[in-house]
Structure formats: C-alpha cells, structure tokens
Amino acid sequence: MKKVFALMMLAISLLMSSAYAAEENTNKEEKQMHQEFTTVFARGAKNDAYAKYFVGQSYLNMLSLEQVVIGNVTFEPGCRNNWHIHHADKGGGQILLVTGGRGYYQEWGKEARELLPGDVVNIPAGVKHWRGAAPNSWFAHLAIEVPGENTRNEWCEPVAEKEYNALK
C-alpha cells in the first residue's frame, strides 16, 4: 500500500512539474513577444500614415530626408507589409539593412528568406515583394531609398495568412 501511495505521489509530482514547466515556457514566449525591443536607432512613432498597407503595428523613424532617404522601420511580432513594388523610370529600388530581431523578405514567385541582424537586401525597382517580422519576434531594418527618376510605390494585396503562417 505504501508503494502504491509513493508511486501515486511521484506521478502527481511529475505531472505538476510538467505543467509548471509548460506554463513557464509559455510565459517566457509571451514575455519575449511583448518585451521592450531596442536597437541602435530609436523606434519612432506608430506608422499611421502607412497603416493600411500593413498587417499589425509598425513604427517609423525617418533618419534622413536629404540626399538619400533613410528610415528605421520597426515591426511588432507578426507585423508585415503588403506586397508592393518600387517603380522608377531609371534607377530606384530600395536597400534594407537589418538591425534587429528576426523577419522575412520575399519576392513574388520565390521562397521567403529569413532575415537576421547584419543581413542586407537589395531590391531592384520593379520587383514585387514584402517583408515583416516573424510571428514571435520584433524586427527592425533601415530602409534606404535608391535615388531614381519618377520613383513611386505601388501597394498591392496583403500576404496570404496561410502563406505567412507556414513560415518557420
């Protein structure tokens, strides 16, 4: 009888430990998603001017409006922009310098590419693409506009939820 009781207590103890560990991991992931995210450049203000072209919350801090336009763009976990194209009659395009977190970049018809701090993405004018944060990570990059003639952006459809959720 004592052995049965001891085994029952051991089983209950193991179950409680597993439940506690699972809860602790969940809490750790939640804290990571909501923790303060800092990079070299200030996050900036909520990107309300372009909010209709994003799923989730992004922030924009314009670092330079002279010579070459440079903005620090920060994405909350799960935030991404719609497919879009940077058009130009000559030159144009964009360069991304990843400064923090984990995100993705994808060109139309190609596989998504994971982005980590230090990665550089050269986006020629006329290429349909999107970028954004991983579901469980903040993401930040510098967006450098390549000078060109008659530059303009064309905003397209959001990234399909099924496609985004399939990313690791």
Residue positions per predicted region:
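Bacterial N-terminal signal peptides
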Residues: 8-16
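Positively charged n-region of N-terminal signal peptides that target proteins for export
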Residues: 1-4
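Conserved metal-binding segment of the jelly-roll/cupin
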Residues: 75-78, 115-136
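Catalytic core of non-heme Fe(II) oxygenases with the double-stranded beta-helix
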Residues: 58-62, 76-97
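A short, N-terminal "cap"/entry segment at the start of jelly-roll beta-barrel domains
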Residues: 22-71, 82, 152-168
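Ligand-binding pocket scaffold of soluble enzyme catalytic domains
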Residues: 77-79, 86-89, 103-107, 130, ...
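Ligand-binding loop in jelly-roll beta-barrel domains
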Residues: 125-153
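A short beta-strand-loop-beta hairpin characteristic of the jelly-roll/cupin
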Residues: 80, 90-117, 127
